[in-house]
């Protein structure tokens, strides 16, 4: 064990916890720390005290256990810690994470879908894996602003073009003049 690992073992002994669960060379000191923190809070660390998880994944699982959410939904090594975080936050808000708790979306896309779900908006317009997270954000913002998003939910528009169309709709402008993929976002902004 290196000095950092030894320090985690000492802290565990000092706090009267069973260090045998994490005093293993397979865990780096940050992973040991996540397991120790869970043990100190009397959590079932067996869910994440596994070499297949990184320290960051372990942290997301530990935080979910602390909040009492069903971590089995995301305690899977094929989810990055960032994806785990989006699923955990969704569970904490008591939303149906099944819409985005899969590897079809990256963590930024998951965040946009989660934000739409939290405010109770029609997430199926946002949860389209053909859109990147920035496009999803423009769609979500349009829904929140009660705009006719059908005028720009087209994968031919990049997110910056979508933003220019959304901003025009927000100001009740005639966007038909510039809502065309042939105009780049700078041109759209000038016309708007």
Task: List the predicted regions and their residue ranges.
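General marker for long, soluble alpha-helical cores
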Residues: 1-192
């Amino acid at each position: 064990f290196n000095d950092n690992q030894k320090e985690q073992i000492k802290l565990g002994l000092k706090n009267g916890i069973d260090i045998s669960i994490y005093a293993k060379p397979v865990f780096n000191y940050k992973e040991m720390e996540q397991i120790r923190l869970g043990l100190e809070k009397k959590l079932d660390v067996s869910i994440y005290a596994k070499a297949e998880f990184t320290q960051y994944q372990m942290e997301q699982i530990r935080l979910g256990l602390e909040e009492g959410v069903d971590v089995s939904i995301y305690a899977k090594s094929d989810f990055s810690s960032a994806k785990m975080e989006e699923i955990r936050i969704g569970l904490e808000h008591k939303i149906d994470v099944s819409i985005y708790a899969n590897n079809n979306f990256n963590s930024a896309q998951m965040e946009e879908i989660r934000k739409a779900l939290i405010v109770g908006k029609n997430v199926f317009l946002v949860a389209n894996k053909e859109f990147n997270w920035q496009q999803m954000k423009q769609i979500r913002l349009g829904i929140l602003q009660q705009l006719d998003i059908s005028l720009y939910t087209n994968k031919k528009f990049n997110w910056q073009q979508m933003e220019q169309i959304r901003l025009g709709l927000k100001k009740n402008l005639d966007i038909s003049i510039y809502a065309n993929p042939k105009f780049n976002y700078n041109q759209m902004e000038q016309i708007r």
